[in-house]
Swiss-Prot record:
Membrane topology: Multi-pass membrane protein
Compartments, as annotated in UniProt: Cell inner membrane
Membrane-spanning ranges: 5-25, 26-46, 63-83, 93-113
UniProt entry tagged with the keyword Chloroplast: no
Domain of life: Bacteria
Species this chain originates from: Shigella flexneri serotype 5b (strain 8401)
HAMAP family: UPF0299
Origin organism lineage: Bacteria, Pseudomonadati, Pseudomonadota, Gammaproteobacteria, Enterobacterales
Sorted UniProt keywords: Cell inner membrane, Cell membrane, Membrane, Transmembrane, Transmembrane helix
Family matches, as InterPro entries: LrgA/CidA, Uncharacterised_UPF0299
GO terms under cellular component: plasma membrane
Family membership noted in the UniProt record: Belongs to the UPF0299 family.
Stated name of the protein: UPF0299 membrane protein YohJ
Entry keyword annotation includes Transcription: no
């Protein structure tokens, strides 16, 4: 019985922490003068807490595993909602594809530039350099 209660406690703690970050993000988003989704702010809060090791990762792991396992199921309502606008999407197919391609290219460029900025140029092991 004790093992069962321990497992229940681990899942309960994980979901309470995840939802606490979510609702903190929603609250902060309601105070901001700009429109930023509360779920994004909540995710950033959770990421900061995990990165600074204020919140141990083992506390949220059980809840994360459950959410990842059933992630495909969580996208079904979104897919059904998109199908309501199928005619509009078909009429605007070209601009949608172009905007997706351009935004993907912009993301690639920004990530590569910021990675280069953070990590700098590194010498490959075994590569001959100018230091001779």
């Amino acid at each position: 019985m004790s093992k069962t209660l321990n497992i229940i406690w681990q899942y309960l703690r994980a979901f309470v922490l995840i939802y606490a970050c979510l609702y903190a993000g929603i609250f902060i988003a309601s105070l901001l003068p700009v429109t930023i989704p509360g779920s994004i702010i909540g995710m950033l809060i959770l990421s900061v807490l995990l990165a600074l090791q204020i919140l141990p990762a083992k506390w949220v792991n059980p809840g994360c595993y459950v959410l990842i396992r059933y992630m495909a199921l969580l996208f079904v309502p979104i897919g059904v909602g998109v199908m309501q606008y199928f005619d509009l999407l078909r009429a605007q197919f070209g601009p949608v594809v172009v905007s997706c391609a351009v935004s993907t290219l912009v993301v690639f460029l920004v990530v590569s530039w910021s990675s280069q900025l953070v990590h700098g140029e590194r010498k490959v092991v075994g590569q001959k350099g100018s230091e001779e």
